[in-house]
Amino acid sequence: MSETDRERPLLASEERAYEETEKVLIVGIDEEEDADYDDDPGNSPKFSWKKLWLFTGPGFLMSIAFLDPGNLESDLQAGAIAGYSLIWLLMWATAIGLLIQLLSARLGVATGRHLAELCREEYPTWARMVLWIMAEIALIGADIQEVIGSAIAIKILSNGLVPLWAGVVITALDCFIFLFLENYGIRKLEAVFAILIATMALAFAWMFGQTKPSGTELLVGALVPKLSSRTIKQAVGIVGCIIMPHNVFLHSALVQSREVDPKKRFRVKEALKYYSIESTGALAVSFIINVFVTTVFAKSFYGTEIADTIGLANAGQYLQDKYGGGFFPILYIWAIGVLAAGQSSTITGTYAGQFIMGGFLNLKMKKWVRALITRSCAIIPTMIVALVFDSSDSMLDELNEWLNVLQSVQIPFAVIPLLCLVSNEQIMGSFKIQPLVQTISWIVAALVIAINGYLMVDFFSGAATNLILLVPVIIFAIAYVVFVLYLISRGLTYTPWQLVASSHKEPQRDDE
């Protein structure tokens, strides 16, 4: 995509993240009238708290993926089995997640397009269809965890009167109610997420205060790296839950909810500055909430015989057995926090599904129709899971392991295209990431992929003793590695024949 192509307006037939009338107006807030700071590179708009407030929103929606029920389960298992020793890893994993999400935001702001749209434009049909299918599979896997988490919380809060499958139906329906708020403006929907995040923070902070974890051990766990063979699985789980493939697609679309002219360099720089501040603050809040959960279970169950048996489904009951009822039973406080996590992540999952499907397939349809399609794709497998696993907490935990592996498999198909695109000057123009940032980003991506690869190998190692399972696993592994290498090769420096090929594409775009 040439610089001219990047700046051309979207055609009427093309899918777009937000219509112009839906975007939050930023221009003219706390700045001189008719100011154009591109004419004076040494000058830039002054920092404005009002502008920061107007840019605040997308980062907090993005941060929900760091607080979904899958992350909560990883937190509680890390605390129960590893104690305080993996808090340092949680901190660095969150920092890695921040880097990936800032690159995603950079892509969306600088190009005016989100990741799924750019993948549709940059990859051949067969490759983008594979990427779309992988993104949808990752989204369905995440959605199962999120909806089941909400259903578990509803079951607890109803004292078991509402079965798991009914909780799934309730979660699916109220998801549409929340998304309906977007018709009244994106800020209304963002306010709902702020309330849900605040609910999580208050619930888990109350539990933190009730159980009184050791502040000294918390500080040591955050500052002193420590890893043993016994806690490797929990360490891999922490890293694996932080990078969610659908969230990479989502953030590049969310940042387009603010009116930013990509043709004006100072506007893009300003937006990136405010989005960086907002995203950092949002993930700092998510880190604190995750620490609350980890330390509560470290204080309560580390070193006990039941530590290995605790999962999302039975965690509340274990807490209740240990700390009793009281005026505010800890079981219900836990359930309220999990419900807020499940509801918020389910909404963002549906939201991400709209952008992924619309971007890859260029579907021009009303948002509620896309939401219905994406919700239907996820609700059927989730309902099956709820009916099959309703009576077994241990089976739910085993299913969660499978779903974590599923997310691990999909990570390269979001992260590699992102890094290739933000490193490409033809797409990003002057906002292409610099060589040092490229190097750091690729090292981080390789580390995350390697860690998740370890999880996959460990999980599928049992297939080595079964010939029937071994053959398809080997075939899948070969195809998987070949496609990942293909994606990486697309990000290498353009060869002369590729430049010639891209130049032939430009007249075709002019005909559009």
Curated annotation (Swiss-Prot):
The chain crosses the membrane at residues 52-72, 80-100, 129-149, 161-181, 189-209, 235-255, 277-297, 323-343, 371-391, 402-422, 440-460, 468-488. One of its GO terms (molecular function) is metal ion transmembrane transporter activity. Pfam families: Nramp (PF01566). The keyword Membrane applies. It is a multi-pass membrane protein. It is found in: Vacuole membrane. GO terms for cellular component: plant-type vacuole; plastid; vacuolar membrane; vacuole. Coiled coil: none annotated. PANTHER family: METAL TRANSPORTER NRAMP4 (PTHR11706:SF111), SOLUTE CARRIER PROTEIN FAMILY 11 MEMBER (PTHR11706). NCBIfam families: nramp, Nramp_1. This is Metal transporter Nramp4. The gene is NRAMP4.
